[in-house]
Amino acid sequence: MSKFEVYLDEGGKYRFRLRARNGQIIAVSQGYKSEEGCIKGIQSVKENAPNARIIVLE
């Protein structure tokens, strides 16, 4: 199962990464000042991604 991981980066900001079932990192977030803000970012991705359009840039 894919999973979101929350971690503290070297600059002291909270970030999340999305890992695929095979362990590959497929997305990394911006830095957040708080763990709570980071978790809200994850919730936003989970709520909005099902409706996201796919755009191929050429």
Curated annotation (Swiss-Prot):
Lineage: Archaea, Methanobacteriati, Methanobacteriota, Stenosarchaea group, Methanomicrobia
UniProt source species: Methanosarcina acetivorans (strain ATCC 35395 / DSM 2834 / JCM 12185 / C2A)
InterPro entries: DUF1508 (IPR010879), UPF0339_domain (IPR051141), YegP-like_sf (IPR036913)
Protein family: Belongs to the UPF0339 family.
Database matches in Pfam families: DUF1508 (PF07411)
SUPFAM superfamilies documented for this protein: YegP-like (SSF160113)
Protein name: UPF0339 protein MA_3316
